[in-house]
A protein has these predicted regions:
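Proteins synthesized as precursors that undergo proteolytic processing into mature forms
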Residues: 1-117
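Intein/HINT protein-splicing elements and their conserved insertion hotspots or analogous self-processing inserts
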Residues: 117, 129-130
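Short beta-strand scaffold segments in enzyme catalytic cores
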Residues: 33-35, 122-129
Length: 130
């Protein structure tokens, strides 16, 4: 026998899928530190924990900093969205802090919304000032 560690759960046994288990394939993995530059200079180094939340959380943190002008603390404190997609799930999980109008719009768009999920992962960041 052999072990695939927990990331092996990202494989599927359904044929003709991108993540179909096959010899030589690697499972989806999310060990992804992030680095943001500003005008070619180091600006922010950060990372998130949380398995499948990592790539989703990275995008949200970058948007909070770059697009919405938040500082590092605000970017980490802002509520996040987690899309559960493995094993046939299709659920949008929300951290507390989203206003009712945002939740209503997501539901109107047909999303299945869930609350109270604790695995959004931790966030750590180092920023360069000046």
């Amino acid at each position: 026998g052999f072990a695939l560690q927990s990331r092996g759960t990202g494989f599927t046994l359904e044929e003709d899928r991108v993540n179909t288990y096959a010899p030589g394939k690697r499972p989806f993995h999310t060990i992804i530190p992030a680095f943001i530059t500003r005008e070619g200079e180091p600006y922010v180094s950060f990372g998130l924990t949380g398995g499948g939340m990592q790539p989703q959380g990275h995008v949200q943190i970058v948007m909070n900093i770059v697009d919405f002008g938040m500082n590092l603390q605000e970017a980490g404190d802002a509520p996040r969205i987690r899309h559960e997609y493995l094993n046939g799930a299709d659920i949008v999980r929300l951290e507390s802090g989203f206003d009712y109008e945002t939740i209503r719009k997501l539901m109107t768009m047909g999303h299945t919304i869930a609350f109270g999920f604790e695995r959004f992962g931790g966030y750590q960041a180092i920023g360069v000032q000046g």
